[in-house]
A protein has these predicted regions:
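Positively charged n-region of N-terminal signal peptides that target proteins for export
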Residues: 2-10
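Sec-dependent N-terminal signal peptides
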Residues: 10-19
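Bacterial Sec-dependent signal peptides at the C-terminal "C-region" and cleavage site
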Residues: 18-26
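Penicillin-recognizing serine hydrolase domain
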Residues: 25-28, 32-34, 39, 91, ...
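Active-site SXXK
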Residues: 36-37, 48-74, 152
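Acidic/histidine-rich, surface-exposed loop or edge segments in extracytoplasmic proteins
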Residues: 38-45, 100-105
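A glycine-rich, coil/turn loop motif that links secondary-structure elements
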Residues: 45-50, 80-84, 138-146
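Active-site-proximal loop and beta-strand segments within enzyme catalytic domains
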Residues: 51, 64-94, 98-116, 127
Length: 255
């Protein structure tokens, strides 16, 4: 297995050079076999860096672990009919599929406020032994939301345990029903921020992207291939195309 793993690392190095030669800084790449519990390929996996909207997976974990009513409607001040109300489950879909920052904030406010939610997120990170992880807000906009690839694999596997997160984050698109001020019902379809890969690969079970200037282009996934489960973490990419190409090569040639 060691020889096989070494060959995969060589292949990944070539892929990294080809796909990311224009990157200004080092990129984090981690592919971990969850089923057999061993790393396959790694690069900069202990580097602490901003994680952008990958943060929202922890926001979702805190929401679901709280046991709060997902069918209750709460205020939402986002792009879909500002000052309207949606159920927490609808907002959870918007947060994980579209990566809607206002949905994350609305969920936090409805639980106990943003400060309380961030406190619970950090508390859960410590409980999961994610000691290099720190959350500063619920959406990931803050550059102070930081983690490592190793920690994010822990968070991914914890998120996978929740049916809601698996079902929602694996949706390529979500249909939201909205009612305007004249009581007219409309349906708005939003695409998953990882829709290109999800449309091509049916092995993706959990998925979340993230993008900020500080974090670069980020992607975390759990995929299932040939009877085994893998975590894929890519942080600090220069372009979404680079990250997508790297993820494609990992899914097709590495695992």
């Amino acid at each position: 297995m060691a020889r096989h793993t070494k060959m995969k690392k060589i292949i990944l190095s070539l892929i990294l050079f080809t796909c990311l030669s224009a990157s200004a800084g080092a990129i984090t790449v981690y592919t971990y076999n969850i089923t057999k519990q061993y790393p396959i390929v790694d690069a900069e996996i202990d580097t602490v860096r901003p994680i952008a909207s990958i943060t929202k997976l922890m926001t979702a974990l805190v929401l679901l672990e709280s046991g709060i009513d997902l069918n209750e409607k709460v205020p939402y001040k986002g792009m879909f009919y500002s000052h309207s109300k949606f159920t927490r489950e609808e907002l959870l879909n918007l947060m994980l599929v579209k990566s809607d920052n206002r949905a994350a904030e609305a969920l936090a406010e409805s639980m106990g406020g943003k400060l309380w939610t961030v406190y619970q997120m950090n508390k859960r990170a410590i409980m999961l032994q994610m000691y290099d992880t720190k959350f500063d807000d619920v959406s990931g906009l803050s550059a102070k939301n930081i983690s490592t690839a190793k920690d994010l694999v822990i968070m991914l596997t914890d998120a996978y345990k929740h049916d809601k997160i698996r079902d929602i984050s694996a949706l390529s698109r979500y249909d939201l029903k909205v009612v305007d001020k004249k009581n007219r019902e409309k349906h708005i379809q939003v695409n998953n921020t990882n829709v290109k890969l999800m449309n091509k690969y049916d092995i993706i079970e959990v998925s979340k992207t993230g993008t900020t200037n500080a974090a670069g282009k980020c992607l975390v996934m759990i995929v299932h291939k040939n009877g085994e489960q893998y975590a894929i973490v890519i942080l600090g990419g220069t372009t979404r195309a680079d990250v997508d190409n790297l993820a494609k090569n990992i899914m097709e040639k590495i695992i």
